[in-house]
Amino acid sequence: MGLHKLPAHLTLFSPAALIATFFGAGLLKPASGTWGSLAALAPGLLIADAYGALGLMLGTVLAYGLGHWASAAWIDGAPNSADEERNADKDPSPIVIDEVAGMWLTLIPLTLFGAALTPLGVAAAFALFRLFDITKPWPVSWADKQLNGATGVMLDDILAGIWAAIVLLAARQFGLI
């Protein structure tokens, strides 16, 4: 296990780096996206417990907005030289605020209509979000390939979260979770 490096124009405690890496979770490797999704669970569950689906919706919107800004600061300020840590500027691995937004979006169906958060439901949400984020079914794959910059970084995970949320809604409807 190692750590990703920050781009030269950011410091560990700069607001853009803290937000983009979700307080450093994205610096862990391998599997930065999994670490970011896991780090999103605790605050997501606290938000869900305190404010329910509406809190998660607002949290998702806030994470998306701040994530878009932080991702743009990360990507736009990076030098143009080749650097495998930046993943060719497309979707740098250390940026995991997109996973946070997608994970919180995925949790929403578990809190609708007064439903209780169960360990099985949370585990299913985590597994489904990671599945759709990694396998990238359409339109997740489209967003990942066609959109550049901060929008591309953020939107593919939102779409993966929507896929996971749809499956969770169906699983809940059929009493599976």
Predicted regions, residues:
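Hydrophobic alpha-helical transmembrane segments
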Residues: M1-D89, S93, V100-I177
